[in-house]
Swiss-Prot record:
Keywords: GTP-binding, Nucleotide-binding, Repeat, Ribosome biogenesis. It holds the Pfam family MMR_HSR1. Signal peptide: none annotated. It comes from the Bacteria. Residues 352-436 form the KH-like domain. GO terms for biological process: ribosome biogenesis. Associates with the 50S ribosomal subunit. GTP 1 binds at residues 10-17, 57-61, 119-122. This is GTPase Der. Belongs to the TRAFAC class TrmE-Era-EngA-EngB-Septin-like GTPase superfamily. EngA (Der) GTPase family. InterPro entries: G_ENGA, GTP-bd, GTPase_Der, KH_dom-like, KH_dom-like_a/b, P-loop_NTPase, Small_GTP-bd.
């Protein structure tokens, strides 16, 4: 089941990004005391009382050229569309403002759970000022201080109480679930339609015409699949495009439900920065990945074109060195018959468990071939290694001191594991732990 989504909404300069950073536990938003400074990373994962969720900072949209009320309305509408629960942030020092009331009117029509939080209540004497906020119509307000971390626990308790009840996954374990992600108009829906042989998803040449995620069940050569098509992710740009940044939340939900993610690239447009960001989301989530270059029929080619493209992809997607690449055309169905066997292969690799004895032999041989470097007179000593998880395959290396496990040596061990076992198409994790 996909994680619940929580959106932080409020007029500019009420402290949304400070609260966002407090909740996720790291400083990922740029925070200054100027309205509209939040940019770039506007969502993250968080956890409260053992429950994980995704959280959005709606201040991440750049609407500086738009009228003030349009900025507020766009933020609120994004939250309404994407979130399961909305945290409505106000400023206790300034009281209820006209802008707060405008936000409240929009949120009130949403029928989504709203938790009203009054920020910048930094001392007990200010608590008498919270009663005016009952007029916004969302019940008990929660006084908090983002800068000092006060009151956030009570607020998050209220948020967690509104999370949807967890449902059992509706598909059997042996069903392979995969999603297609990419920028708008790279041809995700066209690929899906071509695979199915029927128009199950409405396709248009206008970017962003596929809404939300669409599950399609399919059986091929006796294997059951669930295909999850997502709305495309548009690069940051004009005001009407800026809300498309939030389609990443739709993609994240699809990614979380998937075993395999097909990262679709438009051959006509080449590789864009947004392609790399999108692929990074799937990699960070630990999903098996296939890179699909679509619209291969639409470009001029010679006998070297595939090699040139492959080298370029490997250079620009260095973090996806494990991902196979397929050059296809949804229009002509070129190489589409390769996709299902490849999906099966990377799905199997994603859930592969290896024998502990074979694994430790591989690690011992690797250490003998390339001993770890010295650090301040100490050398990393590896005692044994065990696989602790699949999807993705995750290995814990028990050592004398995890601080001595340099990133480069961790990568070296990962490469040796990949050489020994069939992990094509899947990320693997190597974690150093101190032996007790």
């Amino acid at each position: 089941m996909a994680k619940p989504v929580v959106a932080i909404v409020g007029r500019p300069n009420v402290g949304k990004s400070t609260i966002f950073n407090r909740i996720v536990g790291e400083r990922v938003s740029i925070v200054e005391d100027v309205p509209g400074v939040t940019r770039d990373r506007i969502y993250n994962s968080a956890e409260w009382l053992g429950k994980e969720f995704n959280i959005i900072d709606t201040g991440g949209i750049d609407l500086s050229d738009e009228p003030f009320l349009e900025q507020i309305r766009a933020q609120a509408e994004i939250a309404i569309d994407e979130a399961d629960v909305i945290i409505f942030i106000t400023n206790g020092r300034e009281g209820v403002t006209d802008a707060d009331e405008q936000v409240a009117k929009i949120l009130y029509r949403s029928n989504k759970p709203i938790v009203l939080a009054i920020n910048k209540v930094d001392n007990p004497e200010m608590r008498d000022q919270i009663y005016d906020f009952y007029s916004l119509g969302f019940g008990e307000p929660y006084p908090i201080s983002g800068s000092h971390g006060l009151g956030l626990g009570d607020m998050l308790d209220a948020v967690r109480a509104h999370f949807p009840k967890e449902e059992e996954e509706e598909y059997p374990d042996e069903t392979v679930k995969f999603s297609l992600i990419g920028r708008p108009n790279v041809g995700k829906s066209s690929i899906l339609n071509a695979l199915l042989g029927e128009d199950r998803v409405i396709v248009s040449d206008i970017a962003g015409t596929t809404r939300d995620a669409i599950d399609t069940t399919y059986t091929f050569d006796g294997q059951d699949y669930v295909m999850i098509d997502t709305a495309g992710m548009r690069k940051r740009g004009k005001v009407y495009e800026s809300t498309e940044k939030y389609s990443v939340l739709r993609a994240m939900r699809a990614i979380e439900r998937s075993d395999v993610v097909l990262v679709v690239i438009n051959a006509e447009e080449g590789i864009r920065e947004q392609d790399k960001r999108i692929a990074g989301y799937a990699h960070d989530a630990g999903r098996a990945i296939i890179i699909v270059v679509n619209k291969w029929d639409a470009i001029n080619k010679d006998e070297k074109t595939i090699n040139v493209w492959t080298e370029d992809i490997r250079e620009q997607f260095q973090f996806l060195s494990y991902a196979p690449i397929v050059f296809v055309s949804a229009k002509t169905k070129q190489r589409l018959n390769n996709l299902f066997p490849l999906i099966n292969q990377v799905s199997d690799n994603h859930s592969l468990r290896v024998q502990s004895s074979m694994l430790n032999d591989v690690i011992s041989d690797a250490v003998a071939m390339n001993p770890s470097p010295m650090d301040k007179g100490k050398r990393l000593k590896i005692f044994y290694t065990t696989q602790v998880a699949v999807k993705p395959p995750t290995f814990v290396v028990f050592v004398n001191d995890p601080e001595l496990m340099h990133f480069s040596y961790e990568r070296f061990l990962e490469n040796r594991i990949r050489e020994a076992f069939p992990f094509d198409g899947t990320p693997i994790r190597v974690i150093a732990r101190k032996r007790k």
